[in-house]
C-alpha cells in the first residue's frame, strides 16, 4: 500500500513539473523568433542603405559616361575632313550633330564635377529641394536634343553608305554611335532623377 502511495506521489510531482518545462521551452522558442526577426530588420535596413548609396552614385557615373561618349562623338565629327564632298561642315546635319555633342559634353562634364564635389562633402551649388528637379528636367532636355541630332544625321549617313563606304562615312557612323550611347546614359540618369524626385514628393 505504501508503494502505491509513493508511485502516485511521484506521478503527481511529474505532472506538476511538466507545464514548467513546456513554459521554459516556449520562452526559448519565442526568444529565438524575436532574434530572427531582429536580424531581418537589420538586413532590411542594410539593403536600404546600399540601395540609397547606389542611387546616390548613379548620377556621377552616368554623367561621366555621357561626357566621355559625347566627347568622342565631338572629336570624330570635328576631325572628319577629307576634302571635296567629304567635309563635315558642308552638311547642316553634321554641323547640328557637332553642336549638340559639344553641348552634351559640356553639360555632362559639369554635372559629373558637381556630383563628385557633392559626394566628397562639398556644398551642392544647387539648393537641395530643387536639385533633383533640375537634374530630371535638364537630363531630359539634353537627351532630347541628342536624339534630335541623331534623327537628322542618320538618314543622310545611310544614303551616303549605300553609295560608298570610306573613312568619312565610317567616322560619321562611329560619331552617331557614340552620340547614341551618350543619349542612353542621359536617359538612364533622367530615370534615376525621376525616381528620386517622386520619392521626395511623397515623403
From Swiss-Prot:
Cell compartment(s), UniProt: Cell membrane
Any coiled-coil regions, as ranges: none
Glycan attachment points: 167
UniProt main location, coarse: membrane
Keywords, in A-Z order: Cell membrane, Glycoprotein, Membrane, Transmembrane, Transmembrane helix
Cell membrane as UniProt keyword: yes
Description of how the protein assembles with itself and partners: Homodimer and heterodimers.
The family this protein is said to belong to: Belongs to the Casparian strip membrane proteins (CASP) family.
Name recorded for this polypeptide: CASP-like protein 4B2
UniProt source species: Hordeum vulgare subsp. vulgare (Domesticated barley)
